Amino acid sequence: MQYPLPIAHLIDAYMRLPGVGEKTATRLAFYTMDMPEKDVEDFSKALIQVKNDIHQCPICGNITEKEVCDICSNPNRDQTTIMVVEQPKDLMAFEEMGEYDGLYHVLHGVLSPMDGIGPEEINIKSLITRLQKNDDVKEVILALNSTPEGESTAMYISKLIKPAEIKVTRLAAGLSVGSDIEYANSITLKRAVQGRTAL
């Protein structure tokens, strides 16, 4: 039996989300259909609002609804340290930890030649430009996931930064190989930041 077209379209839309297969998408579609109309309207407005109002900070690449994100525009942050993360959700994880008060740079991905993702596809060039324009930065912390792609990206960035004589460090043990930063608890992240090592 085929679903009516509007439901089929909704199932297809949900299946575009990462990790959502046909069964989950179908369940979500029927749940959405049973929601009060106001909740559905609020949900759709939230989707449109996030697409219209959220953009990348021109300095660090974090997501923001302002011209420049709150972290970059905060003069009380440590201007001598930049932590490089893969995604905004990783930045949020470190902010929730509350132990790091420096700046960030969000790559929005990692190098993955198999997937056709090279240096031009992620936010590396702007990091190098940022470092060239800012003499205050003394350390760059590469806080990337411990995956082959994360490791190769860290090494690539490290080689680009070395000539600038800026200290480049990597998060310490505490994050197991293959683990994602967003799922690590605050104690693990704190130990990783405190025990970072030079590259």
Curated annotation (Swiss-Prot):
Top-rank taxon, per record: Bacteria
First and last residue of the signal peptide: none
GO terms, molecular function: DNA binding; zinc ion binding
SMART domains according to UniProt: TOPRIM
Alphabetized UniProt keyword annotations: DNA damage, DNA recombination, DNA repair, Metal-binding, Zinc, Zinc-finger
GO biological process, one term: DNA repair
Residues in C4-type zinc fingers: 57-72
SUPFAM superfamilies: Recombination protein RecR (SSF111304)
PROSITE patterns: RECR, TOPRIM
InterPro entries noted in UniProt: DNA_Rcmb_RecR, Rcmb_RecR, Rcmb_RecR_Znf, TOPRIM_dom, TOPRIM_RecR
UniProt-listed Pfam families: RecR_C, RecR_HhH, RecR_ZnF, Toprim_4
Domain Toprim stretches: 80-176
Family stated for the protein in its record: Belongs to the RecR family.
Function: May play a role in DNA repair. It seems to be involved in an RecBC-independent recombinational process of DNA repair. It may act with RecF and RecO.
Protein's name in the database: Recombination protein RecR
Species this protein is from: Lactobacillus helveticus (strain DPC 4571)
The encoding gene: recR
